[in-house]
Amino acid sequence: MRARGLVALAIAGVMAAAAPAFAQDGKKVLRMGWAQEPQTLSPFVDQDEEDFRVWSLNYDLLVNFSPEDLSPTPGIAESWEVSPDKRTVTFKLFEGHKWSDGQPITSKDVEYSLETFAPNSLLFGSYVENVTSIDTPDDLTVVIKTKQPDARIVGGLFAYILPAHVWGKQSVKQLTTSYKPTPPIVGSGPWIVSEIRRGRLIRMTRNPNFRGEKPAYDEIHWIKYGNTDAVERALTLGEIDVVPEVQQATFARLAKAPDVEAVQSSSPSFTQLTFNLCSEEICPDAKFDPAVQDRSVRQAIAYAIDRKRINEIASRGTAFEGHGLLPDYYKAFYEQPAEDYPLDVDKANQLLDEAGWERSDDGGVREKGGQRLSFDLFVRSESPANIQAARLVREMTQPIGVDFKVQVVSVDKLTEITTRKIDGKMAPDFDTFIWGWGGDPYDPGLLLNLLTTKAIGGSSDAFYSNPEYDRLYDQQSGEFDEARRKAIVKQMIDLAQRDLPYVVLTVDSALQAYRTDKLAEPKRVCPEPDGDITCDQVGYAAVAALEPVSAAAGGGGDDGGTSGLVYVLIAVAAGALLAAGLLLTRRRRADREAVELEK
């Protein structure tokens, strides 16, 4: 009873604080809610969706993407010209374009970003892997040469252009280890990060030097909540205006909430079961059960997993069954793999029998040569759907003699486990985990790159290495003929399905929601007509086009001038709810912040 009283008081305090009394500055504020915040906001070391949501509003690309159809559109560059042999692209930058701090944007910023930032970052290096030289004959001209034709240089060079006069003051070692940008974070986008309160708020304010049309909102507030339930509750209470990523478990409920519109759209994203395949040569100090590197074991696990059931239960039917590395979102490149691993427990048992994995005396976990088919399965505490999927994988594989010990850890801990290094070499400390990847909406290259050898130490999380896959990757990246490229990509997908560094469980939809009494009906973009409403991992155009409803229609927008006190009280309310056990809780162990789920 006492806990409920505290909750009521806390919520009352929040609602009182959120009243229009705090709208005296008259600013229009777009309030976004999330349960997971960026780690450092450094493009050198971070790779999570939340980072991209902020980066894409803070920084421009050399060439942007139209939110209508994802075609190339001016960014830092005003125009570009491709040579007849398609190996040289000359870019002309906008004249008079300035960073948010007033410094001019020049070709040297592009040169720094593509020569220093991208190759040394965790995620962006693949976009410039074919670049042989970058010349800057004057402040407004950039000439990029490649070793082979690469369509991504114009149509998919997704590497943010950073201000060299800011980032260039740090050494590469500092940038890739310890450096964290601090507000105001100099940028070229419509808003820049002006305030960071860890665990509470990231405030973005309008960039006075933004080149494009002035956006309707003066500020964007990214408000941190304790978990996804709290985020979605805040939307129904009107504390926030938009949830850019809604959980599958609550999507149907939000769709029925008053003054809330829930939006479902296709996306180039999937959720996968990942196996640690790092070789001793590449990862001499890695920690994992060697049995996980037996391909027959991985194939048997794939046959034992009912992907349809995982979608129905874990994703609440909002996703689709996974069929290999590429989602069918990429219609120009998708073709069902040669081996799709339909549910077949008998086939799974047969594979393990033939590989010499024998049932133990009690008929439980299989064994061979002193090894048991018992693996850790890590999953993020921030994702209820992933936790449910992990439990289902454990249940589904028990009949074939495989035992998964599900370990729920924070996203920071899982990142640490999967990216651990010793003496400069990768040393991942896991057997398996469940997480997900989102590809570029305009090209499958980013997802294909995940399984290349050169991605190890960067975006690779399975540490898969196959020279034939690498050769095919290089071949397709320089192929401009769509039909020929599709045939090469098909070979890559079949290789990945044979070796199974990933078992793709589901192809995920983009699920979002917004307040109809706060936000004027937005366009569905990236691409039109049935894409999402923010497109905020690709660029800023869709968010910059959002508008509050008119004052006559309900006064939305102007009452968004919420003070810092409101966010403190919101956090207090969430804390009280957690203490009362009314929200999803997360227990931690001191040694690994993990909870082993025995049941």
Language-model features and meaning:
Residues A19-A23:
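Sec/Tat signal peptide C-region and signal peptidase I cleavage site
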Residues Q24-L30:
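Cleaved targeting-peptide boundary
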Residues D25, K92, S126-Q170:
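Surface-exposed binding/hinge segments that line
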